[in-house]
Every structure is written in C-alpha cells, then in structure tokens.
Amino acid sequence: MKVLFTASVMGHLTGFHIPNMQYFKDRGFAVHIACGPGDTPACADRHFVIGFERSPFRLKNISAYRALKKVIRENEYDIIHCHTPVASVLTRLAARRARKHGTVVIYTAHGFHFYRGAPRLSAFVYRTVEKWLSRHTDILITINGEDYAAISRYGFRPKLGAYRVPGVGVDGARFHPHTAETRRAVREQNGISADAFVLIFAAEYNRNKNQAMLLRAVSLLKDSIPNILLLLPGEGPLQAEYQRLAAELSISQYVRLMGYRTDMDMLLAAADVAVSSSRREGLGINLVEAMLTGLPVVATRIRGHADIVQHGETGFLVPPDDAPAMAEKLLKLYRSPELRHEMGQKAISAAQPYRLENAQAETFRIYERALDMKTNRAGGK
C-alpha cells in the first residue's frame, strides 16, 4: 500500500501534515511526498523533488506536471492527498488516469482563492477551475464555513463528498495559559517593560497579511496608549517597507519587526491582545494559538477569522483595512483589564475544537472513509 502527499513547498508538509503521514506509516503504508526541496521527514520513505511554482501561470509548472504524472504512473498509489493551490491543481490533473485504476484522491482546500471580497474576475476564474477539478476529486476537505458552503452553492461534485475539519490543529500541550511569573520572565528576556500594553501578530510580511493596517492603528493610539508595543514576529518581502512606514508615522519605538521566531508559545505569554490584519485567511491558526493561551483577539472580519472569533465574546472583528475601527477596539480593551480577562477566558474555551487531537480525529475519520472506498473499488474489479 502506498500514499502520496503533495504540496508546493516542503515546509507546508513538515509544518502541518507529519501526523497525517504518520497515520499511514503506522498502518503499513509506504509514505511518499512530492514537493519542493528540503529535509525529508523521518516518516516519509521517498521524496520526489517537484519544482512547483507559486503562480499558476508560470511555464515551469508544465514540467512539474509531467514529472508528477510520471511519479504517479510509476508508483500506483492507493491514496493521494494534495495540498496548496498549484500543487493541488497539478496533482488532480496528473492523477486522472490513476483514479480510473482505483487511486483515491483527497484535496484539502486551505482557503479557496474565490472568497467574499475577492476581485470578481479572479474569483470567477478560480471558482470555475475548482468546480471543474472537483470532478477529478474523490474527497474535498475545507477548513472554514464559507468554503464548505461554497461547495454546494456552486455545484462542486467531488465523488465521495465534502467535509469540513477544524484546520490542521494546534498543539494544546504547547499553547496554553501561562503564569504571571512566566509572563514577567518572557518580557524581561525580550526587553519588554512590565507595564507595556503588548499586541502581537505572527505572520509573513506581505500584502495579504497587511501589517500596514496595524502600524496605522498604532499611530492612532500612541497618544492614548503611550506604553503600546506591537510585536510582529515574521519575515518577508515587505520588511523594509514596513520599517519605512513605521518611521514615517513616527512609531518606530512602538513597533518591533522581530524576524522569524520558533518560540511563539513563549512569546505569546508577553502579550495582552492578539491582532490580525489579514485580508484573506483559510482559518487563522495564529489566532487559535493565541486564544489557547488566553488572549482576547481583535482581527479583520474575513473568512476564517469569523469561524474562530466570536465578536463581542472572545474579541472583536473589524472591517478589513479599517485602522480606526481596529484602534477603537484596542483602546476599549486597554481601558478594561477585566474585559480582556473575561474575553481571554472565553477564548480558551472557544479554541478547544481546534486543538491538534480534535483536528486529527476528524481528518483520520476521513482517511478511514477513503480506505473503505479503496477497498470497495478493489472489490469491484
């Protein structure tokens, strides 16, 4: 028995799908992966390096398609699980013949590229492509309510049906409420004053994550909250631009672009409020992590965020790109430590369905359904 996992980059597979690979490994499957270069995880028996390009319009994806089709033809997989937009398109195209011979193809949409508020032309194109490809998909998995509803709304037809799971899951043993002592220690280690009002948003510095909105919100709050501090762990192409914007807004001393961090579980202990300025998300795992530690949230009202944040209960949702609205809600939380605590406690409870063990249980049940389908197909030969 063989299973293939595909994604554009290795980091996606190693960051989110090791438990899924291990599920098959424990059941005697040979686990193969097809993605970009990187260190092969221990649970993978073979790694096929495929040069997927992030843009679907790059000619190099033709070579990626041919290489992937060859891998699928030669290995006769029982199950293929594809992730990330371009890799999932090419995988389903390359696996069409394999499906006729019994291969079960699973596709997880980590956020459709047609979404409420998307440019109309691009939404139409992506929706049309996804609808056509659904005919070449056995199981379609979504991670938020808007995407799940879109499947029936637009007439997608995956052979075995569609499912909604609570994302890839967050490790509750790692992300949990911290003691006051830990909070003090983390602040001291990171040079953060004890009385600072700390906001945090961990994300790549790019247009979609839209950290410029947060910088503008801080500029509106610096007089009302003179001890405000915005922590931005991450890296990306807009780092220099955001540094310039902070300087132009005269808020450099209130903002820290921290670079890539591997200690987010501890860094969250230093924060008072988790924020997100994203324009598009599949789910918003960074917010789940923050909520599990007991932080209230102020985030943009978009797909994914609306699944996680209960407006007025676990935090607040504001219109995308509306820095004044963001500032207003942050000021409200700043002025009421009691409200922050109350919302933070509710956030812990609201985030429980997104814990790793719960997300895995849902995904594993889908795998069992796929294995049953595989058995039935084999029996029908």
Regions found by a protein language model. Name each.
Residues 48-49, 131-181:
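Donor nucleotide-sugar binding/catalytic pocket of nucleotide-sugar-dependent glycosyltransferases
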Residues 67, 176-192, 339:
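A short helix/loop element that forms part of the nucleotide-sugar donor recognition site in Leloir-type
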Residues 185-188, 325, 332, 339-353, ...:
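A short, well-ordered alpha-helix in the C-terminal region of glycosyltransferases
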Residues 193-209, 215-218:
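Conserved donor-binding/catalytic core segment of Leloir-type glycosyltransferases
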Residues 243-259:
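Nucleotide-activated donor-binding/catalytic signature segment of Leloir-type glycosyltransferases, i.e.
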Residues 260, 279:
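Aromatic "clamp/platform" in nucleotide-sugar-dependent glycosyltransferases that forms part
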Residues 296-299, 309:
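Short hydrophobic beta-strand element within catalytic cores of glycosyltransferases
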Residues 311-312, 316-323, 332-337:
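Conserved acidic donor-binding segment of nucleotide-sugar-dependent glycosyltransferases
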